[in-house]
A protein has these predicted regions:
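N-terminal cap/lid segment of alpha/beta-hydrolase-fold proteins
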Residues: 26-57, 110
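The serine-hydrolase catalytic nucleophile loop
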Residues: 69-81, 95, 281
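Catalytic nucleophile-loop/oxyanion-hole region of alpha/beta-hydrolase
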Residues: 72-75, 98-137, 309-315
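Conserved alpha/beta-hydrolase
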Residues: 82-102
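Alpha/beta-hydrolase-fold enzymes
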Residues: 149-229
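Short beta-strand/loop motif that positions the catalytic acidic residue
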Residues: 262-263, 269-271
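Conserved alpha/beta-hydrolase "acid-adjacent" motif
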Residues: 276-282
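Catalytic histidine neighborhood in serine/cysteine hydrolases
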Residues: 290-304, 318
């Protein structure tokens, strides 16, 4: 080996070692696979425990789950790691019908069921010996951002809320994504699906995302790009489908209607500046109806930029600091 090659090899080895040491130092927690029940079904999740929890010590805790059809492997581990490194116990889980959790029909999205799963996750967390049940925060993104708005308004066990790029009014949202002349046909299609399921028991499905011009639940280009890439690289068990009934249930969902009831629980909303999936102006209008204490964070980019790169820093650090401010007093 000539001297130049040898020195390049040494430098590359030193750089790799430094990166590995930084990564190891950054992970000041351990993660455990956990299960708990919700309405008789087993939910599967992760429990993050910060290093240094003393015997008998109880830590503030963050409970979190994903948005429309997504599973925990789709970047929730990055957010949970950030919060755990900040000293929080973190519970991450998949809803009934998704991921490794039980429940039928598969890929069926019912907001009331998912909110119930959140409530049961909070209950389970509060029973763990290292959890302070009086210092529980919740985090949600997109469709689960809607869920945490609802929970924050009605579940007083929750002491802090972070809603990232949340859905605030599904009907208003839907009218932005679907042409007005297509709307009556969509309603007729949903009614026909209900009739078919009622008379035959058949469960019909629709892709979560598809190529432009093809029917899907999330008909934006950035939705297609993110779900297909993230599913392939991080969550091979993710299924690109949801029940047709899921859309009908979503259209009746208006979590922003009660946003004023979240107070006095602290609320942070993280809104993307160029969000075409859960439109920016709808989220900001809802935030305006929330009462103090509250904080608005504007994220550069679109809906899915919150999960990676600089967008992850812009979304996760304010969330961590908000939880610290209100749960680590």
């Amino acid at each position: 080996m000539n001297p130049t090659t040898r020195w390049v090899s040494i430098l590359l080895f030193a750089a790799a070692l430094a990166v590995s040491q930084i990564a190891a130092a950054a992970e000041n927690f351990n993660r455990q696979d956990v299960t708990f029940t919700s309405v008789g079904k087993k939910l599967v999740g992760w429990l993050y425990l910060p290093n240094g929890i003393k015997q008998g010590e109880k830590r503030p805790t963050i409970v979190m789950a994903h948005g429309w059809s997504a599973v925990k492997e789709m970047y929730l581990d990055d957010f949970a790691a950030r919060f755990a490194n900040g000293g929080f116990v973190v519970v991450v889980f998949d809803y009934r019908n998704f991921g490794d959790s039980e429940g039928e029909p598969r890929s069926h999205i019912d907001p009331s069921m998912q909110i119930e799963d959140y409530k049961n996750a909070i209950t389970w967390a509060s029973l763990q010996p290292m959890v302070d049940g009086n210092r529980i925060g919740i985090w949600g993104s997109s469709y689960s951002g809607a869920h945490v708005l609802h929970l924050g308004a009605f579940d007083r066990r929750v002491k802090c809320v972070v809603a990232q790029v949340p859905l605030v009014n599904a009907m208003d949202n839907f009218r932005r994504l679907v042409r007005a002349d297509h709307f009556p046909g969509t309603q007729a299609w949903l009614a026909a699906d209900r009739t078919e399921e009622y008379t035959t028991g058949k469960i019909n499905y629709l892709p979560v995302v598809d190529e432009q011009g093809k029917p899907s639940a999330l008909p934006t280009q950035d939705s297609y790009d993110w779900f297909i890439k993230t599913g392939q690289t991080r969550a091979p068990k993710w299924e690109n489908r949801n029940t047709v009934r899921s859309l009908e249930l979503a259209l009746e969902y208006n979590p922003g209607a009660n946003i004023h009831l979240i107070s006095p629980t602290p609320l942070m909303m993280i809104v993307a500046q160029h969000d075409v999936l859960t439109p920016t102006d709808l989220a900001i209008e809802a935030y305006g109806r929330a009462r103090d204490p509250k904080q608005l964070v504007i994220l550069s980019g679109g809906h899915f930029d919150a999960y990676t790169g600089s967008g992850f820093q812009q979304s996760s650090m304010p969330a961590l600091n908000w939880f610290k401010q209100h749960l680590m007093k």
